[in-house]
Regions:
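N-terminal donor/sugar-recognition subdomains of glycan-related enzymes
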Residues: 2-187
């Protein structure tokens, strides 16, 4: 990667790295992507449904070791910094305004997504709308990360609401008006 960044035989190095690290993992990455797309198509609080084909995703993830990936942007042919999606660090304060449901932008860490799932009580338990709103500014980048995230455990309790781009204007959603769910009846 270092030689590649410096421009040393970029084409040859990219081909070697792709053959050694990316191609052996394409089947797994594609399978995970397709599984996550299927889950989101059935999920009631993901309103975008136009998932790009796997081959059209703007990022490829080259496994770095068992836990980390190096993202590669195909358009610019550049490698990013290594990512550890399970690194146990919370990068921001998700609970700044407790008067409204949590709103977090561009969360791509599996660890942070699981943290939000585990630390925000269900709307039924608090008697008011208390979902976690995840705002993703770029649909294609969000879709690219579906290759490396595991959404199944995150979606089971239906706590998450995915807002893409301009859908942020829907925050917070009136669940009673839109879905016929009155959380004030629950506790």
């Amino acid at each position: 990667r270092s030689l590649y960044r410096r421009g040393f035989q970029r084409e040859t190095l990219l081909e070697l790295m792709t053959q050694a690290f990316y191609q052996p993992n394409i089947k797994l990455l594609k399978s995970r992507y397709e599984k996550n797309c299927r889950l989101l198509r059935k999920y009631p609080y993901c309103f975008q449904q136009d998932f790009p084909a796997f081959e059209e995703l703007p990022l490829r993830f080259y496994p770095y070791d068992d836990q980390r990936y190096i993202p590669f942007t195909a358009e610019t042919e550049t490698f990013g910094e290594p990512l550890d999606l399970r690194h146990p660090v919370i990068s921001r304060n998700f609970f700044q305004n407790l008067d409204k449901p949590v709103l977090a932008a561009d969360v791509y860490s599996q660890y942070e997504l699981e943290f939000l799932r585990d630390n925000v009580r269900k709307s039924e338990w608090v008697g008011r709308e208390n979902h976690v709103y995840l705002h993703y500014t770029d649909w294609e980048i969000f879709c690219a990360y579906l290759q490396v995230l595991n959404l199944r455990p995150l979606l089971e309790e239906e706590k998450l609401v995915f807002l893409i781009g301009d859908e942020i204007s829907q925050y917070p959603i009136d669940f009673q008006a839109r879905f016929g769910i009155d959380y004030s009846r629950y506790p």
